Every structure is written in structure tokens, then in C-alpha cells.
């Protein structure tokens, strides 16, 4: 399974 890149999820 391809995991999303780690990082803070900041809504636009």
C-alpha cells in the first residue's frame, strides 16, 4: 500500500 507523504495537514 502506498502511504501518503508525512507532513502537517493544513487546510487551504
UniProtKB/Swiss-Prot annotation:
- Entry keyword set: Hypotensive agent, Metalloenzyme inhibitor, Metalloprotease inhibitor, Protease inhibitor, Pyrrolidone carboxylic acid, Secreted, Toxin
Q: Which residues form the signal peptide?
A: none
Question: Organism's domain of life?
Answer: Eukaryota
Regarding tissue, the record states: Expressed by the venom gland.
The molecular function GO annotations come to: peptidase inhibitor activity; toxin activity
Q: What is its main location?
A: secreted
Q: Which residues carry this modification: Pyrrolidone carboxylic acid?
A: 1
Family assignment from sequence similarity: Belongs to the bradykinin-potentiating peptide family.
Q: What role does it play?
A: This peptide both inhibits the activity of the angiotensin-converting enzyme (ACE) and enhances the action of bradykinin by inhibiting the peptidases that inactivate it. It acts as an indirect hypotensive agent.
Could you tell me what this protein is called? Answer: Bradykinin-potentiating peptide 12e
Amino acid at each position: 500500500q502506498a502511504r501518503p507523504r508525512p507532513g502537517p495537514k493544513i487546510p487551504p
